[in-house]
């Protein structure tokens, strides 16, 4: 009875019993193998202690150190990873039993276990092993180390030499037998409650939480037992208080015979006696309350622990978020400081350059000082932008500093309907930005593209200066001031003045104040006399107004005009300009003049600029309408008037006019470059503040820059081996693509815009030609035999939208705005088709070759009528496959703006036409 009680109590207080799996082993050739194993690996244990390579290959390992033979033969790195058995609840315990030749069974439960498992074996397992080895029962259970007086006397009477000769196993077995006898005697004397009764079994868990009794002699133990028996009859009315530890909890009972708490932790050896005391076992309602309080206490501790963990996690997240924000702010500050330092270095370099005209130097410095706050304001606007555009602005700042973090094109393309995407997104190397199709993101991309274009022009201008030096005096025109009755030579254009405009107003000021006593060459007179500068600007405004009212040229230049001009058409044009000037002079008041004076400080206009503006109003705009780029009311009336409100449009207009005039006049190449740079610089600021008011000005500037880039594609004006207009043979693609980003930024246009219908794509009529029976579009007619096998086009074809747009281009070849539609086709590519093209799809490449033939044929056909297409026809080869290193793929990557000018290896000048 006592042995059964000990076994039941052992099951109650120990961990849940693990399942045992007995594996019977036999000896074969001196090795122990399992009798149930099958297959070719029957006579080994599948390298359970072998190296990692043999375990992975499931082959036998000789377990050689430092490297096994198989790893040595295969030249592999041999590693031995320690075995970590899973300590899961209810795990299976494998017990190996060896059957000898005589039929007897030998237990090997601890032979094959790793050292870490042997250390984790409980005292119960040690006792069981010892008892099994001696043929005893497996149901032994260790009790307290304290024994009765009679037992201690019997142990002391044993011979000393027997103790010395005992092995550790026999000593453990003897101690177990003695403890077993002591437990039998104890329960026979104090067995008021059956050991297997429900009261005793249910109290097993709480018994572990009771404070242990210190081990001592048997007399003290009996005294404590008697005192506790006396206290058992008294009702326990005192409530139990919850505490942090079980010792504090159960130590709160005010019992006279309660032993003092010990400093060491509880163990089986020092707490078993106190656990088995009868008076320590609660019963009835008190026991239920104790269990409930204990459960509530455990839940409270668990909740507190979860709250502490949650607070720590939230604190860690806040710290990480603060660190990320701080790092981003530091990076932006570093970018801003580095950018400002570069600007300061540019200012210092320009101040150190020799300049004979001190007034011009002072005017340049004043202009750059005014540009400083504007650049700071732009940086502050970037810092105050929302989180959706933070990464785009940061990349824009990096690009302005020359730190390119992108391996492909920096310009997004506008898909059908104005959907913004780029090559990084297609190739999966771009971090997604929230609301990537927002107006702010498009504006940032356009500003970045304009910054790259401006940087490209500045580098080209600097290279021209290094290789060819400054232009000679004979290259610059010498205008005369008819209004003042005297002549003065304008300041010679310098290639180093790439960012600032040429011929500052201070030179005109000296012409107008030649008879005055104040010397304009004195720096103090230029810096301190602000009113004098305002007067000079006002004189310039009056001069402009007088030129428009009287239609008399104020600048006399040596020009070689064509002699076959139609006098009647010229007089009609003059009358129209006079009428427009009269209307503007009547409607313009004092406020408009003040506005012109304020805007003139951003872009200085000299007499050469007046000539260029007059040339546009008389000669250039008819060529634009002849190319069917919108109607005459836009380019003749609307654009010149709008240019006085937006300096970036004025500079773009003057650059295009200078390009047209440079075909017949020399010495204007530097003016083309300077006005183009000023237009790009001011456009970078304007695209960050897109509104409905400046939309038309931005679109007009983009269209003019596209036409100017096409006109300068061949790089006609050259000195030595360098192009004076700073355009490389393949750079026109780069600038056409960059200017197209402005159209992407302002897309979609408002219906009140003058350019509402320009380069629009309407594919809504495709729904009327769909054949539902065969699932194809039968109205799309093949216009190129090289892609005839792609027709009819299925509804699920990835080429559907692209072929539909090409079909509309082919049909509308003779309609208006076709030139802009055909050159902006890459900006309207379907996203799916663009992905196929970037991955080298043959069908997509064939379609782009067909488009190239359409582009080449149109440019060749109209080059005699449209002057700014003459340069394009000179750089486009006859066949797209003439490109070196891959043919059409390189050409289309160039035209799509895939990293130009850094990525492209194509040089158009290498091809002979």
Curated annotation (Swiss-Prot):
It holds the Pfam family Fungal_trans_2. The keyword Lipid biosynthesis does not apply. GO terms for biological process: cellular response to hypoxia; positive regulation of ergosterol biosynthetic process; positive regulation of filamentous growth of a population of unicellular organisms in response to starvation; positive regulation of sterol import; positive regulation of transcription by RNA polymerase II; regulation of transcription by RNA polymerase II. Residues 303-346, 440-472 form a coiled coil. Its main location: nucleus. Residues 50-80 bind DNA. The modification Phosphoserine is found at residue 519. Keywords: Activator, Coiled coil, DNA-binding, Metal-binding, Nucleus, Phosphoprotein, Transcription, Transcription regulation, Zinc. Residues 103-173, 216-258, 347-385, 453-489, 552-571 are annotated as: Disordered. Residues 374-385, 469-487, 552-562 have a biased composition (Polar residues). The keyword Glycoprotein does not apply. Induction: Induced by anaerobic conditions, hypoxia and cold. Repressed by heme. Residues 222-241 have a biased composition (Low complexity). It comes from the Eukaryota. This is Sterol uptake control protein 2. The gene is UPC2.
